[in-house]
A protein has these predicted regions:
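Rieske [2Fe-2S] iron-sulfur-binding domain
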Residues: 2-11, 15, 20-24, 34-161, ...
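Non-catalytic accessory segments flanking enzyme active sites
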Residues: 28-29
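Short, isolated positions within intrinsically disordered regulatory regions of eukaryotic proteins
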Residues: 33-36, 101, 142, 202-204, ...
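C-terminal catalytic domain of Rieske-type non-heme iron oxygenases
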Residues: 65, 148-371
Length: 371
């Protein structure tokens, strides 16, 4: 059974409860997104980023607290990132308006006189909750004009299984809408063609696979299983430990794929997010940690090539998508993509109606495909 991709994408956008501009983007608001690496912010310096087509200025206060503000002065629109930051307040370079970095509240307008009755404290620059975690500045992107909930869950944290481990971060941009990036990330059938190599898998190694999936809150899980026998790293790990190798893969809204691999006392944990930048641009932010005897430099060589292969494929796909072709999703290999669109549409619908979200999976299911 096949379904048009366009209709699934449109269903997700049409259900959005916010402004027309927001619904047209197909983005999911009121979630945490990684804006940039922690290393990009130094001392009292400022850094800029864009999430969901919102320009941001980010930094740390003198006491080390991360903050994120809309990079636009509410007075005349000049980017606040051109201003001066003293560790507590951010001063606009145009008229000297000052804003408290962690709240966005205006604290000074130099042009006001004793005759003016303007209540400065009622003016706010755009501000978003911000946390540092796993080497990223995470920003909670609440929808335009909406009030923040009284409590917000903490930003996502990479799962680790020992006190000592190695960790590394990688990123690459994809010239596509975030939906295309996400369904590409979860696609199980492209490996032997896009990622074929002597150390991963070869084209002739394609064989039928059976995987069990189960629903989880806001997502789905590929249940713990023995990983692909046609992938050399897994075979090497089992040979080294003498223990079975199991892997568990989760996807949760809005854009997070995690994978945990265990074999005896050894483990590998990774998270990939497809971060929406603009309607035509997204970014894979990848972080991995492990206690294997694998140097970071060696892992990065292979991981960079792996991500570059995905990036090159998405660049080629973007050429075809310029002409708005009719696309389709098939069973069973594309079923995870269908679940993603179902999750997205149902989450947006629950926001609009106030009703509980209906999960597109009624229960555990077994899928079959060849890869």
């Amino acid at each position: 059974m096949s379904e048009p991709v366009q209709s699934l994408m449109q269903a997700g956008a049409a259900a959005a409860p916010e402004t027309v501009a927001e619904s047209d983007t197909g983005f999911l608001w009121d979630f945490w997104y990684p804006a940039l690496r922690s290393t990009e912010v130094r001392g009292n310096g400022l850094a800029t980023a864009m999430l969901l087509e919102v320009p941001l200025v980010l930094g740390r206060t003198s006491d080390g607290k991360a903050f994120a503000m809309r990079d636009s002065c509410p007075h005349r629109g000049i980017p606040l990132s051109y201003g001066r930051f003293d560790g507590k307040t951010l001063e606009c370079s145009y008229h000297g308006w000052k804003f408290e970095a962690c709240t966005g509240q205006c604290v000074e307008i130099p042009s006001l006189t004793s005759q003016d009755k303007l209540k400065v404290e009622r003016i706010f620059a755009g501000h978003y909750p911000c946390e540092e975690r796993d080497g990223y500045f995470w920003v909670y992107m609440n929808s335009h004009g909406s009030r923040l909930p009284e409590t917000i869950a903490a930003a996502p944290k990479l799962t680790t299984f020992s006190e000592k481990y190695r960790i590394t971060h990688l990123a690459c941009e994809l010239p596509s809408h975030v939906d295309q990036g996400i369904i590409g990330l979860m696609d199980p059938a492209h490996g032997p063609f896009v990622h074929q190599s002597w150390y991963w898998r070869r084209r002739h190694s394609i064989h039928e696979k059976e995987k069990k999936f189960e629903p989880i809150p806001n997502g789905f899980r590929m249940s713990p299983h023995t990983p692909s026998s046609n992938s050399a790293p897994y075979r090497m790990l089992q040979k080294y430990t003498g223990e079975p190798v199991t892997t568990t893969i989760d996807f949760v809204l809005p854009n997070i794929r995690t994978e945990e691999i265990r074999s005896g006392k050894l483990w590998f944990s990774s998270r990939a997010t497809v971060t929406p930048v603009r309607r035509d641009l997204c970014r894979i932010d990848f972080v991995a940690a492990w206690n294997l005897l694998l140097p970071v430099t060696i892992f990065r060589i292979f991981a960079k090539k792996f991500l570059r292969q995905d990036q090159e494929t998405m660049i080629l796909q973007a050429e075809g998508l310029k002409h708005n072709p009719r696309l389709m999703l098939i069973d069973d290999a594309d079923r995870p993509a269908k679940w993603y669109f179902g999750l997205k549409a149902n989450w947006l619908d629950s926001r609009r109606t106030g009703a509980a979200m209906v999960h597109p999976m009624s229960g555990p299911v077994t899928l079959h495909w060849r890869s």
